[in-house]
UniProtKB/Swiss-Prot annotation:
It comes from Homo sapiens (Human). One of its GO terms (biological process) is adaptive immune response. The gene is TRBV6-6. PANTHER family: T CELL RECEPTOR BETA VARIABLE 6-2-RELATED, T-CELL RECEPTOR BETA CHAIN. This is T cell receptor beta variable 6-6. V region of the variable domain of T cell receptor (TR) beta chain that participates in the antigen recognition. Alpha-beta T cell receptors are antigen specific receptors which are essential to the immune response and are present on the cell surface of T lymphocytes. Recognize peptide-major histocompatibility (MH) (pMH) complexes that are displayed by antigen presenting cells (APC), a prerequisite for efficient T cell adaptive immunity against pathogens. Disulfide bonds join 42-110.
Length: 114
């Protein structure tokens, strides 16, 4: 019996702003077994209201998972199934993978804007 693994790479997507400001995304890399859960953290220090989570599958463009227009306000994007988000503060927008599946093997991007 083989063990199937799900791999995701998380890279911050930075937007223009003040010097030394940006989006911080952790962890940078993570490998999960099928069925495991994990949270990708995203924090921004630019006081932006809008925050976004995207995924990019091999050979494809970006797909919006979830977005937020302010603290306490979140909405689904194109591919929300299997994910959850929360936005308790302006700075933080964590993305939770509930039960890792091979179809979620992807590069994940967090972004913010005014």
């Amino acid at each position: 019996m083989s063990i199937s693994l799900l791999c995701c790479a998380a890279f911050p997507l930075l937007w223009a702003g003040p010097v030394n400001a940006g989006v911080t995304q952790t962890p940078k890399f993570r490998i999960l077994k099928i069925g495991q859960s994990m949270t990708l953290q995203c924090a921004q220090d630019m006081n932006h209201n809008y925050m976004y989570w995207y995924r990019q599958d091999p050979g494809m463009g970006l797909k919006l998972i979830y977005y937020s227009v302010g603290a306490g306000i979140t909405d689904k994007g194109e591919v929300p199934n299997g994910y959850n988000v929360s936005r308790s503060t302006t700075e933080d927008f964590p993305l939770r993978l509930e039960l890792a599946a091979p179809s979620q093997t992807s590069v994940y991007f967090c972004a913010s804007s005014y």
